[in-house]
């Protein structure tokens, strides 16, 4: 007999989460004009406003405009441009991430909101190849730069390819942004910045955010079999395996872990781990979360408990990790308070007891 819906626990880890450059839960990326930040990092705008951050008043959109808005920007008030999430500037001409393709070097540049307190670095080295903050040329934004010579042989070396037919030279590098210093989360980004030397075109920036480039995530049962559905109260092993970490790093451990589910436009979520330790709420609800390291991998072991009662709904996980130079160590967490025994009724034992000797 197939299990009833109340006993079926579906897993859909990470696959449907949209990875983008705007995530309203990151510092410096608020929803404007009364908009609400949703569980997936997108803004739900109030009536009359639109745009990725609800920053555009629909009543001000102009059919006729005295300026040209680039990169799919929208003209409003007749002479101003509302930009998409990847561009900025008076006419949306400036990308947040770009490079100056100089004769002998590639100067990588990035703009971030003034509230940004994270780090931007080349994937080869989180510490040796950081972009440093400089005086910003655009008010209201921080500006970061790193100038890398074409012939660099150090940790910040560029990837160089030469077209055998045309002789064109191509340089590229992967640039990572993390919004919390020393940590990596679901909505931190990775972009490829490149310079192509033939007609000296503007640098090309491609969003290649795919967290499987850094870590692979697997869900399995206690027998290490990969799973997509599991019985309620069975055990889930959620493992983060390092794949291509920034230079100098080998291990991964879990800092924060959140589980959530969406049903009928309602979101239920629970924070399972905070700063490496099981939360009191998770303990009270019986999730029994264990945070471990297995070699160089980080692993959370938890009990499968649905977030909606009597409903077959997939669950998703959001996470924040820390990379380690070798095998990670999990800090010692305080023990949760013992639960008081009920005294108002006679105990009714379920099943055969276990004798501890």
Swiss-Prot record:
It comes from the Eukaryota. Disulfide bonds join 24-37, 31-43, 45-54, 65-75, 69-81, 83-92. PROSITE patterns: EGF_1, EGF_2, EGF_3. GO terms for cellular component: cell surface; extracellular region. It is found in: Secreted. Residues 21-55, 61-93 form the EGF-like domain. Residues 1-20 form the signal peptide. One of its GO terms (molecular function) is signaling receptor binding. InterPro entries: Dev_Signal_Modulators, EGF-like_dom. Prismatic layer of shell (at protein level). Expressed primarily in the mantle with highest level in the mantle edge and lower level in the mantle pallium. Keywords: Disulfide bond, EGF-like domain, Repeat, Secreted, Signal. Gene3D superfamilies: Laminin. This is EGF-like domain-containing protein 2. It comes from Pinctada maxima (Silver-lipped pearl oyster). The lineage of its organism: Eukaryota, Metazoa, Spiralia, Lophotrochozoa, Mollusca.
């Amino acid at each position: 007999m197939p299990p009833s819906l109340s006993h079926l626990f579906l897993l859909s880890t990470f696959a449907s989460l949209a990875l983008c450059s705007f995530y309203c839960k990151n510092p410096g990326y608020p929803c404007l004009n009364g908009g609400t930040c949703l569980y997936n990092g997108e803004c739900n705008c109030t009536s009359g406003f639109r745009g990725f951050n609800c920053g555009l008043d629909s009543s001000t959109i102009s059919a006729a405009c005295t300026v040209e808005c680039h990169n799919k920007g929208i003209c409003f008030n007749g002479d101003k441009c509302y930009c998409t999430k990847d561009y900025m500037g008076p006419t949306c001409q400036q990308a947040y991430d770009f490079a100056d393709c100089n004769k002998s070097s590639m100067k990588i540049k990035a703009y971030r909101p003034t509230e940004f307190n994270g780090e931007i670095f080349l994937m080869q080295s989180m510490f040796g190849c950081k972009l440093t903050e400089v005086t910003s040329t655009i008010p209201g934004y921080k500006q970061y730069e790193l100038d890398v010579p074409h012939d660099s042989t150090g940790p910040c070396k560029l990837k160089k390819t030469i077209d055998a037919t045309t002789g064109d030279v191509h340089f590229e590098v992967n640039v990572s942004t993390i919004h919390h210093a020393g940590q990596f989360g679901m909505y931190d980004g990775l972009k490829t910045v490149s310079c192509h030397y033939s007609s000296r075109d503007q640098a090309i920036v491609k969003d290649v955010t795919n967290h499987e480039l850094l870590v692979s995530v697997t869900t399995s049962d206690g027998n290490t079999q990969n799973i997509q559905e599991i019985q309620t109260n069975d055990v889930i092993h959620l493992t983060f395996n390092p794949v291509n970490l920034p230079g100098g790093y080998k291990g991964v451990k879990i800092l924060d872990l959140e589980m959530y589910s969406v049903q009928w436009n309602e979101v239920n979520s629970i924070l399972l781990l905070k700063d490496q330790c099981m939360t009191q709420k998770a303990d009270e609800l019986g999730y029994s979360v264990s945070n471990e390291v297995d070699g160089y991998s980080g692993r959370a072991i938890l009990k499968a408990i649905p977030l909606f009662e009597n409903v077959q709904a997939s669950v998703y996980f959001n996470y924040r990790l820390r990379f380690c130079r070798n095998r990670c160590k999990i800090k010692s967490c305080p023990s949760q308070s013992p639960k008081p025994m009920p005294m108002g009724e006679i105990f009714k034992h379920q099943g055969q007891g276990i004798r501890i000797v």
